[in-house]
């Protein structure tokens, strides 16, 4: 059985992972889904992105935890400038995401995670 934790590298998810390691809980892999602003620029605050890649990921890897970084083919800019394809607002620009109906969450985070989940063995937790 493979044990995977999803991680945003915020205080809560990172604390959960560190506590699991400290208490000997099984943990084979950590999955982080990075939302990109455009094809080259991360949507993360630059200091947080630096922390993730130069401190957090190397620290987990030193403890024997594989870290997988996922990214969507779509970016924030793609969604912001994309056109609505159906409904009464068909043809209008999507522009700013709306809370509760956020295409960024759906297309830039959830889809890559679900795609990755389908590639895993069925007994993955």
Map each language-model feature to its residues.
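ATP-dependent adenylation/nucleotidyltransferase module used to activate substrates
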Residues: 1-125
